[in-house]
Amino acid sequence: MSNSTTGLVKWFNEEKGFGFITQDNGGDDVFVHFRSITSDGFKTLAEGQKVSFEVEQGQKGLQAANVVAL
């Protein structure tokens, strides 16, 4: 279940390294871990930031992969 989509960062906790993304298509919010962010240096996201990502089924529900800030 891997498809590319876009969304906005709902929230992201830099200290814990995770947060959630609200999908533009109205689907369920998607968990995002800092390891899924494709950027150099410190991997973090800002609330309200536009991102593209792939949705995968994780152990505890939907999770984001290959997250790219737009």
Curated annotation (Swiss-Prot):
<keyword id="KW-0805">Transcription regulation</keyword>
<dbReference type="InterPro" id="IPR002059">
    <property type="entry name" value="CSP_DNA-bd"/>
</dbReference>
<dbReference type="GO" id="GO:0005829">
    <property type="term" value="C:cytosol"/>
</dbReference>
<dbReference type="InterPro" id="IPR011129">
    <property type="entry name" value="CSD"/>
</dbReference>
<dbReference type="InterPro" id="IPR012156">
    <property type="entry name" value="Cold_shock_CspA"/>
</dbReference>
<keyword id="KW-0238">DNA-binding</keyword>
<dbReference type="Pfam" id="PF00313">
    <property type="entry name" value="CSD"/>
</dbReference>
<feature type="domain" description="CSD">
    <location>
        <begin position="7"/>
        <end position="67"/>
    </location>
</feature>
<keyword id="KW-0346">Stress response</keyword>
<keyword id="KW-0963">Cytoplasm</keyword>
<protein>
    <recommendedName>
        <fullName>Cold shock-like protein CspG</fullName>
    </recommendedName>
</protein>
<dbReference type="InterPro" id="IPR019844">
    <property type="entry name" value="CSD_CS"/>
</dbReference>
<keyword id="KW-0010">Activator</keyword>
<dbReference type="InterPro" id="IPR012340">
    <property type="entry name" value="NA-bd_OB-fold"/>
</dbReference>
<dbReference type="GO" id="GO:0003677">
    <property type="term" value="F:DNA binding"/>
</dbReference>
<keyword id="KW-0804">Transcription</keyword>
